[in-house]
Amino acid sequence: MAKLLLFLLPAILGLLVPRSAVALGTNYLLSGQTLDTEGHLKNGDFDLVMQDDCNLVLYNGNWQSNTANNGRDCKLTLTDYGELVIKNGDGSTVWKSGAQSVKGNYAAVVHPDGRLVVLGPSVFKIDPWVRGLNSLRFRNIPFTNNLLFSGQVLYGDGRLTAKNHQLVMQGDCNLVLYGGKYGWQSNTHGNGEHCFLRLNHKGELIIKDDDFKTIWSSRSSSKQGEYVLILQDDGFGVIYGPAIFETSSKRSIAAS
């Protein structure tokens, strides 16, 4: 099980991730992807549904787009500017989140606290499909979840998992991505004791040891905000942020 703790240490890279054809994640939607009618994004008890009545509903998160019966065969997409858009089957626009930023790669995520959050653009990417210094072979490790948010920590063999890919903060102080063709690692084996990985509120991944000495950093730095590291189903580990749109509790919505 991934060990996630909330830390109070604040502290990103301007890198845009090239578009690749990837499968829709279970709890995230990337720029250019579509959530079809009756499609779901889930995180624990929270379920985002693009309903057949054209209403986008976050069950147990007390939010909806209020577009019931405004169209048929509706679909939700996330643009390259971080805007969520619901379109009717005829292509007309039914609803927009209204939040836009610079062109890039964004992610809409069902947050574990019950919010729908759009973060981006991407600021850092771990690539296990390219041969290089950080390559290593795949080995079998048990699975857990795929998201690390700002302020959260992985330590003591804590891991993120997605399909056949696993990002592990190993007890030997090495951060390792198992999967892809070549895998990836931070090359910090044996460089510290009781090391942990933290994503800060400026989008930077940092490995620190028990004395809080920095062992490794993604060297990505952007403005203060909320970020997320997603271990995607295609094997890429990508940091998106800051948040440019998020839902808040409105009224309770009963499941139909």
UniProtKB/Swiss-Prot annotation:
Motif (Carbohydrate-binding motif 1): 51-59
Molecular-function GO term, any one: D-mannose binding
Chief localisation class: secreted
Highest taxon above the source species: Eukaryota
Disulfide cysteine pairs (residue numbers): C54-C74, C173-C195
Short sequence motif Carbohydrate-binding motif 2: positions: 170-178
This protein's UniProt keywords: Disulfide bond, Hemagglutinin, Lectin, Mannose-binding, Repeat, Secreted, Signal
Subcellular location: Secreted
InterPro entries per record: Bulb-type_lectin_dom, Bulb-type_lectin_dom_sf
Gene Ontology biological process terms, A to Z: response to other organism
Phosphoprotein keyword on record: no
Domain Bulb-type lectin: 26-131, 145-252
GO cellular component: extracellular region
Record: residues binding beta-D-mannose: 51-55, 59, 63-64, 170-174, 178, 182-185
Signal peptide: 1-23
Function text: Mannose-specific lectin. Shows agglutinating activity towards erythrocytes from rabbit.
Subunit annotation: Forms heterodimers.
Name of the protein in its database record: Mannose-specific lectin 1
Gene: L1
